[in-house]
């Protein structure tokens, strides 16, 4: 039995690409169901499908997934489950968007062309091939706390920058097997579609993303190093999807390892080595006052996410 399943909150990361011409009409029923069942997190709806991460009781999440699966034309979403000791979200948001994952390139359609899916159990063999180039499609702050052995860091701040990186690094990809990965798989749907559209044929991506790999591949067989950043209050997870000791800098929202917190530039709620030089003394004074109010609120038993 998965020891993590004893934790009180079930976290579901999901996405599905499917034509949803009437996606606006789906927003209110989803929001009502989530609020009625104590579910929190974010769901994105667009004409191309649905994407999001939510948390709640196991029964509540089961109701939500049944509702989503029953949406006409949508079908079974790609799902990754994990568990949390505390509710990892502060509120519930259902948003209408142009894209369910923002790449900013017109005409990219994973339903028409996408890379070859590689199951977690087969991933190690693919990336060990000397003719394979491994590309981390995530952002630089995600790469910084964990990635696969030998993976290239495109040093992007947002996914919108990824297409330009590919164009500028074609020579590193030519004649190679291109193996891409991301947190849960959705960014790779568009990344592999984009790369294939440029004429590359041997394009692969990790099915279910890092989360599925960490869930299914035993630690002793794993070639993952570090933690996997997640976009909720857990901040990061490790092998077996266990909660990690990575925290967020509340000034810039970069992930911080225990080692990062030893920096002379780290002050809780005020700055870290990554953002100290980016902020003015006035900014830091303002953050310090906010942190003071957060601590006072915690002492009173108020919501601990004030200022987060």
UniProtKB/Swiss-Prot annotation:
* Pfam families on file: Rhodanese, UPF0176_N
Indicate the residues that form the catalytic site.
182
Annotated GO molecular function terms are: oxidoreductase activity, acting on paired donors, with incorporation or reduction of molecular oxygen
- For the protein in the UniProt heading, the enzyme class is oxidoreductase
Out of the domains of life, which is the source?
Bacteria
List the SUPFAM superfamilies: Rhodanese/Cell cycle control phosphatase
- Alphabetically, which GO biological process terms does the record hold? tRNA modification
Keywords in alphabetical order: Oxidoreductase, tRNA processing
**Gene3D superfamilies attached to this UniProt entry:** 3.30.70.100, Rhodanese-like domain
Q: Does the keyword tRNA processing apply?
A: yes
Q: Record's InterPro entries?
A: Rhodanese-like_dom, Rhodanese-like_dom_sf, TrhO, TRHO_N
The Enzyme Commission number assigned here is 1.14.-.-
Q: Which family does it belong to?
A: Belongs to the TrhO family.
Q: What does this protein do?
A: Catalyzes oxygen-dependent 5-hydroxyuridine (ho5U) modification at position 34 in tRNAs.
What name does this protein carry? tRNA uridine(34) hydroxylase
Recorded name of the encoding gene? trhO
């Amino acid at each position: 039995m998965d020891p993590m399943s004893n934790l009180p909150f079930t976290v579901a990361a999901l996405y599905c690409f499917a034509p949803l011409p009437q996606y606006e009409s789906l927003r209110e029923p989803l929001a009502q169901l989530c609020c009625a069942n104590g579910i929190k997190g974010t769901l994105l709806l667009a004409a191309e499908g649905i994407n999001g991460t939510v948390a709640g009781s196991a029964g509540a999440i089961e109701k939500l997934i049944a509702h989503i699966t029953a949406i006409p034309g949508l079908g079974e979403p790609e799902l990754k489950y994990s568990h949390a000791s505390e509710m990892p979200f502060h509120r519930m948001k259902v948003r209408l968007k142009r894209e369910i994952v923002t790449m900013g390139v017109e005409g990219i359609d994973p339903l028409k062309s996408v890379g070859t899916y590689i199951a977690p159990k087969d991933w190690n063999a693919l990336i060990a091939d000397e003719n394979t180039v491994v590309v981390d499609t995530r952002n630089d702050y995600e790469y910084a706390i964990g990635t696969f052995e030998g993976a290239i860091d495109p040093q992007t701040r947002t996914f919108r920058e990824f297409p330009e990186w590919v164009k500028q690094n074609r020579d590193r990809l030519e004649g190679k097997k291109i193996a891409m990965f991301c947190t849960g798989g959705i960014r790779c749907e568009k990344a592999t579609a984009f790369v294939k559209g440029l004429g590359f044929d041997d394009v692969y991506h990790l099915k279910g993303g890092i989360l599925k790999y960490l869930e299914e591949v035993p630690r002793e067989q794993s070639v993952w190093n570090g933690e996997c950043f997640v976009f909720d209050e857990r901040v990061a997870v490790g092998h077996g999807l266990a909660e990690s000791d990575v925290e967020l800098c509340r000034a810039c929202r970069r992930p911080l390892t225990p080692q990062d917190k030893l920096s002379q530039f780290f002050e809780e709620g005020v700055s870290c080595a990554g953002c100290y030089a980016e902020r003015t003394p006035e900014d830091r004074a303002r953050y310090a006052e906010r942190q003071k109010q957060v601590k006072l609120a915690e002492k009173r038993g108020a919501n601990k996410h004030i200022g987060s």
